[in-house]
Amino acid sequence: MKLNFKTRIALNYFVATGVVVALVFAVVYISLKTTIYESLDSDLNYESEIHLEELNLTQMVFSNREEWEEREHEEVEVNPVFVQILNAKHEITDKSPNLNEDRLQFFSQQEDNIHFNTTLNNRLIRQVQKPVKIDGVLKGYIITAMSFEASQKIIDQLLLILLISYPTV
């Protein structure tokens, strides 16, 4: 089928516009997702460093637990931070009061200091496992996690909006 000149120009314009809009939508989605992940990862790193300073490295427990618990009770937290301490044998030696009877899962196959998504009580969390070393000897791990559900809902909603609005643009 041979198309006339005007039809070919219109078709090329239509396809080019569709590709450009798709690229813009992809950039918006990827930018937002990356920003959310970087923000959560930054918060997790900060919390890990703070709690690492409060750690009794010989016993792998929080050094001043009473003060730590008081601070946790005084703060109103929208995104609570979960902290768990493991010894070198991956046994729990201490954990934050907000974990109650729950525990954060240790993933031995996961690389150290890499942030990843997992679940706690069937709820989405973002977690990082950092080794605790003294003079190069592994003493244990500090696991820090935060809820990721609200952030994931935002990412999912944006994707849905972009997919629905793409055909109309």
Briefly describe each language-model feature range.
Residues M1-F82, A88-K89, F148-D156:
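Juxtamembrane segments flanking the first transmembrane helix
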